[in-house]
Amino acid sequence: PNYNGGNLENKGNNGATMTSIHNYFANGQDSSAISLANSNLVGVSDDAGTNGYGYYLSWGNMYIDFKNVSSNNDVTNYTRDLDLKTAIAGVNYDKGSTHYSRENFTSYPDNVIVTHITADGSEKISLDVSVEPDNSRGSAINGIGDSSYQRTWDTTVSDGRISINGQLTDNQMKFSSQTQVITDNAGTVTDGDGKVSVSGASEVTIITSMGTDYKDEYPSYRTGETASELTNRVKWYVDQAAVKTYEELKANHVSDYQEIFNRVDLNLGQTVSTKTTDALLSAYKAGTASEAERRQLEVMLFQYGRFMTIESSRETKTDGNGYVRETLPSNLQGLWVGANNSPWHSDYHMNVNLQMNYWPTYSTNMAECGQPLIDYIDALREPGRVTAAI
């Protein structure tokens, strides 16, 4: 079970069933072959129509409630951006005479998600941070019914850190996350009921790490960790990151990312346009974009694909404390999904879609990003022998 649901065991002597299906097809009895396959080969179904396969879902939501912004009318010059050269997402806006900036990135070397908020001007940062796993059922996509996915968890807040520990209800997979809120010397951090509050700060850094006891190893697919061992593992990563400055965390991330990303530079004669990406897309579709703008959008899309691969598929890493960090390959939605019922459940379609994810990996000099797929296929050999013997 890579996600909720799980790898249910076989339903019987499928070898004999396959022989009967072949005979039906050979005799032109297609409907009988299909009926037998649906009744004997397909896994046990649930109310989501997933045949017991399960699906990836979002971890949850982080809420950052800015206390000094009451409505959209309070801010001006609002922009959002993603810098493909650094893999850093940014938000910038002005409120009165104060400029607010927010940077977000996911660091592979430090195994944390980092949010950094600054205020430059007369106003100071005042906000609440909370984290909540998502138990919503989601909406039907591609004709698939609502998710029955549920989980239970406990949340504690201490010393500016939000700790969440829980378990999935259907396959008992454990999960844990920790979020540390840090301010500059001028700021005040206060623990609350399920949240951390900040006031009077010019700079805030939010560091999050998370983990589960999943391990891609037949037959248990579990690390064997106790709940406390999993919690300690997640805590270690946040502790290690929290003693570093934001600039150190950012430099680690950018250096690691660019070592792969900068290996390929595509030049199609593009020029940098002052238009926003959505404006470029509209002009491209309408046929009003210049040749240089069309080339810019095409190069951007090419590099965006490489960015997504680097950010969702990295090789196994052994950290300084001996923790081995394994990574599953990117699924049909990559890795970062903001919904609890994504198309195709963010699963792995072995027929061609999974391979398509990795087509550019080797040809654009990102071989290490292909290792999770190789490891995943290798891990299928042992259960595959069991299937072949049925």
Predicted regions, residues:
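Aromatic-residue-lined binding/catalytic grooves and analogous aromatic/hydrophobic interfacial grooves
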Residues: 1-390
